[in-house]
């Protein structure tokens, strides 16, 4: 479908070409925008693809500062950052990046100057000195270097020219925001050699208040610079070199506020009081609405791995967060540690175009990028009000943890970091023959290497490690005050990854991808053209597995062997076929009709490392496939003063990749789905100086029949015949949840053995062995007959059909895909007032609304995210003769704080929810000068 409103209206330059017509009419012709969506320059209205394009002026006019703002101007698009390092979900028509892990590919390919960016800064950096930002909707693998089942975002930088030009912009806004942008273009040898230098910086105060220490966090301190060199030694040979650097060092919050409907644990089970055993029967948080007052509770620490171990070893007694609630203000947090965010990247590109003849052009495009990210923040987002018990390990309730520091509070920190390197080499041959047959073919080699580290560091984990140093095998050399000589405890302030007193999910990952792709065009006549595109892709993925087992052997636990290194190969042929036709309808000036069938593909991958034997985890996940049908029309009407474009689409999706967190790791699964919808985009200039625009997107998604998945937030599906129990430290999945028969649990409680329930989660035989093991050896010390009865004769492990110790799978049939609102709409209007002295004033307003959606495939009330809207207004004064522009703006006029996405953690973390919110009201004033 066609141009977005912003795509065609450029505010800092004349947006319309006036035609000679009677003064009474005073209508205007909307300026034509040239794009390269098909790797060649074409008028946007002539491109048979659903594409929205934005010039730098358009981005500025609509206050689209970066990738997250694009959703407010494009139908059927949603955007949210993810929970982990340098990750985000840009979703088009329900397809995005819901799989989590180093080997998971984006469903929407992000490109810079047509080169794929596996790890980019789309959600961190801001747009500056760009020629265009193009967003293509639908599968695009036959022309773009990395497969993209959902679409493509292509950021095209402004290139050096043979004319001197420069501009500078200084902006000041609320939150003490200072934003500077500038560019200078310097021709050196006429049209043969030129250099273009551009840059941007942003420094502002934070949006969030940490009420624990009164610090303002989630600030920004970042900059980016870009240098390009154009060298065209001949008319036939044209080259361009680019270097771009990005740097950030601030307190950006990787996640938003943490919500939890506290689970206090049941007072009774089967009519039997639980007493102190209730601490082993809580899952931390319950699946309540994120908008209910109860959602501002705190995690029951007994439902977490760290709290479970603290209770078992006596450092804590139940919920360390008892009585704690959080502020109902989504921009207030309470954490012992302020967030830290550091990011650096360098990108290098070299593009060569050589005209082999007047009708044949060869293109070589080389791209290399390298980057690193380091982030840390408080994991539980609340300061526990109850101190540690006073024990030999915690004298006076205090403990000096090597990573957390000296405190008497239950404290957990997560550190997410990574470094990456990528290289791509693409060759392309494109024809422009006079005859009916033309082509655009190419090949790409792409390599990507990354090492991601995700740590969860807790003083309760270190305390448990020390306790186990003295248990069973005994290690009297372990010093509980200094942690010196304690087996498996990392004494470094910055974790090295060698200790087992913290959780470290370390993933070295390598991707090697090769592909041949291209399209052939047959022009039957001047109005009708057929297109055939094919792509052959081969992906090779490898992950080196590291043990993620906490509390390793040598001090009390049995270590399952680490899973072997994983390798996977995926090979697939995809393509598209269709036609476009320029129709003469009589009532339009120009009409383009098009229809295409395409097959999209995204490779499968390898789930992040887990200990062998962990419950319910597959080592790999399968590829995605989509069969897509799209029909559309692009129309120019009313003597060029109206653009009206429409697209309808239907997708048959096989293997849509989704993720959930199980046993402290991301587990990616596949589901089938149907997707259909339509999009409308229109621009109208009824009179001179007035422009109106509107977009409407409708999206319907439906998961296929027979699809099911265990919902870790509700493992029993609310069936009272079963009870959730925490998994004890004897299992590789320690801290997770299991499901046991309620009658059996009640019998165990009635026998006074409720404290042994966590050891039941590995089955009857292991439970019986624990019960009968002497207490001095770490067991319960019960008589053999009693142990046999409790493990085998209580019905503890009796399950109906479909149930298991993991729970029962929820039926997903007919559910909606996550982050897929039914409706996305936007409207805009601007009017330019001509003032005296060569000045003009342009007033513009934009409004966007998104209907409700679900954060997960389970579509429960807990998953429901409410509809939200946003309004922006700008006022700009121009004096072209001076090259001066002064503008003022307000973004998010209503200062609303919508929840735009939510992340559910795993059972061992208490099933809390990190929510992602939009920016608050922002306003400011700026002055620009161009030369």
Task: Tell where the protein language model's regions lie, with residue ranges.
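Gram-negative outer-membrane beta-barrel transporters
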Residues: 527-530, 650-652, 669-857, 926-930
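Acidic, small-polar-rich N-terminal luminal/periplasmic segments of exported/outer-membrane proteins
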Residues: 29-163, 631
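Outer-membrane beta-barrel translocator/receptor signature
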Residues: 105-107, 119, 128-137, 142-225, ...
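C-terminal beta-signal and adjacent terminal beta-strands/loops
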Residues: 31, 456-459, 463, 701, ...
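A surface-exposed, glycine/aromatic-enriched loop/edge motif typical of exported proteins
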Residues: 239, 243-318, 373-396, 449-486, ...
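Periplasmic-side early beta-strands and strand-to-turn transitions of outer-membrane beta-barrels
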Residues: 154, 161-163, 169-171, 187-285, ...
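Structural signature of Gram-negative outer-membrane beta-barrels, strongest in the C-terminal barrel
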Residues: 230-232, 429-432, 438, 442-446, ...
